[in-house]
Curated annotation (Swiss-Prot):
<dbReference type="Pfam" id="PF03167">
    <property type="entry name" value="UDG"/>
</dbReference>
<dbReference type="InterPro" id="IPR002043">
    <property type="entry name" value="UDG_fam1"/>
</dbReference>
<keyword id="KW-0378">Hydrolase</keyword>
<comment type="similarity">
    <text>Belongs to the uracil-DNA glycosylase (UDG) superfamily. UNG family.</text>
</comment>
<dbReference type="GO" id="GO:0004844">
    <property type="term" value="F:uracil DNA N-glycosylase activity"/>
</dbReference>
<dbReference type="InterPro" id="IPR018085">
    <property type="entry name" value="Ura-DNA_Glyclase_AS"/>
</dbReference>
<keyword id="KW-0963">Cytoplasm</keyword>
<comment type="function">
    <text>Excises uracil residues from the DNA which can arise as a result of misincorporation of dUMP residues by DNA polymerase or due to deamination of cytosine.</text>
</comment>
<dbReference type="GO" id="GO:0005737">
    <property type="term" value="C:cytoplasm"/>
</dbReference>
<keyword id="KW-0234">DNA repair</keyword>
<feature type="active site" description="Proton acceptor">
    <location>
        <position position="64"/>
    </location>
</feature>
<dbReference type="GO" id="GO:0097510">
    <property type="term" value="P:base-excision repair, AP site formation via deaminated base removal"/>
</dbReference>
<dbReference type="InterPro" id="IPR036895">
    <property type="entry name" value="Uracil-DNA_glycosylase-like_sf"/>
</dbReference>
<protein>
    <recommendedName>
        <fullName>Uracil-DNA glycosylase</fullName>
        <ecNumber>3.2.2.27</ecNumber>
    </recommendedName>
</protein>
<keyword id="KW-0227">DNA damage</keyword>
<dbReference type="InterPro" id="IPR005122">
    <property type="entry name" value="Uracil-DNA_glycosylase-like"/>
</dbReference>
Length: 226
């Protein structure tokens, strides 16, 4: 594995592509027109700020950002401190409590501590209009995040991908299963969690795969309060 590669090295060229410029221009024009777009502009690329390319150990794929006030901040499934934990994350915490010995459910939904340990919390679409789920689904973000996954697939070794729900599983279809570990389950949403997300033991499995490679396991425990 090449240690010194950065996000800029592997996906920097995407920023020069016309599709990417068009996506950014559209989002900016929507903001200028007075529409409320989440997350705020400064947070759109936070997943890449908190987790440097060579530090990626685990990838959790989300769909698009939360579309309620003060929730989204650029990390999938995560919400800002002081905001009620959303239902899918409640189920993730339930699974962690069953799966990871001693895990205590925190009183918040802020997942920055995972990101700083090498868990890339990546939504496949990076912006959304307030109150309108999937409103930015066909802008070009998907092309960009495909390139992100391709870069990890190509340049890294032994990354554990957690793909929950059909959307994430389709997105991960080209990941090389000989180089990486792919764990799949239904989405943690209340609509589907009982179909096999709860009981999937993905968090402990991810850690076992990391330990088997001589990597440090993820400490899934979050601060109980912020």
């Amino acid at each position: 594995m090449t240690q010194q590669l950065t996000w800029h090295d592997v996906i920097g060229a995407e920023k020069e592509q016309s599709y990417f410029q068009q996506t950014l221009n559209f989002v900016e024009a929507e903001r200028q027109a007075g529409k409320v777009i989440y997350p705020p502009a400064k947070d759109v690329f936070n997943a890449f700020r908190y987790t440097e390319f060579q530090d990626v150990k685990v990838v959790i794929l989300g769909q698009d950002p939360y579309h309620g006030p003060n929730q989204a901040h650029g990390l999938c499934f995560s919400v800002l401190p002081g905001i009620k934990t959303p239902p899918s994350l409640v189920n993730m915490y339930k699974e962690l409590a069953q799966d990871i010995q001693g895990f205590q459910i925190p009183a918040h939904g802020y997942l920055e501590a995972w990101a700083k340990q090498g868990v890339l919390l990546l939504n496949t679409v990076l912006t959304v209009e307030q109150g309108k789920a999937h409103s930015h689904a066909s802008l070009g973000w998907e092309t960009f995040t495909d390139k992100v996954i391709e870069a990890i697939n190509q340049h890294q070794q032994g990354v554990v991908f957690l793909l929950w729900g059909s959307h994430a599983q389709k997105k991960g279809r080209f990941i090389d299963r000989h180089k990486h570990v792919v764990l799949t389950a239904p989405h943690p949403s209340p609509l589907s969690a009982h179909r096999g997300f709860l009981g999937c033991k993905h968090f402990s499995q991810a850690n076992q795969h990391l330990l088997d490679q001589g990597k440090q396991a993820i400490d899934w425990q979050l601060p109980l309060s912020l």
